[in-house]
Amino acid sequence: MVRPLNDFHEAKVRIKLSSYSASLLNLSCNNVLQSIKESNTSVKGPVFLPTRRRVYCVLRSPHVNKDSREHFEIRSHFRIIDISSCSSETIEMLMRLDLPTGVNIEIKT
């Protein structure tokens, strides 16, 4: 059930940011923290979560040379920001926040 914005005066909000690029993620965390601090709310974070590393092994040759392989990896970086007492203005600021395209954001109450 979705609560109206008026019920967020004492809500706890968790923001989870994820990206393949650590530099974009740090830039986005700084933007989120700056907008939260403008509304004078207490915040914890950013909390660095473990980096998920996925390695893919691919044969270099399409037909022979099974011993010749190539490894590719994808690293996923995660951060969490907790807001303890959040107002409706803060929620609206977070919804209007402009983040880079490589960053995924989840806002949970």
From Swiss-Prot:
It comes from the Eukaryota. One of its GO terms (molecular function) is structural constituent of ribosome. SMART domains: Ribosomal_S10 (SM01403). InterPro entries: Ribosomal_uS10, Ribosomal_uS10_dom, Ribosomal_uS10_dom_sf. It is found in: Plastid, Chloroplast. One of its GO terms (biological process) is translation. Its main location: plastid. GO terms for cellular component: chloroplast; ribonucleoprotein complex; ribosome. Keywords: Chloroplast, Plastid, Ribonucleoprotein, Ribosomal protein. Part of the 30S ribosomal subunit. Belongs to the universal ribosomal protein uS10 family. Involved in the binding of tRNA to the ribosomes. This is Small ribosomal subunit protein uS10c. It comes from Cyanidium caldarium. The gene is rps10.
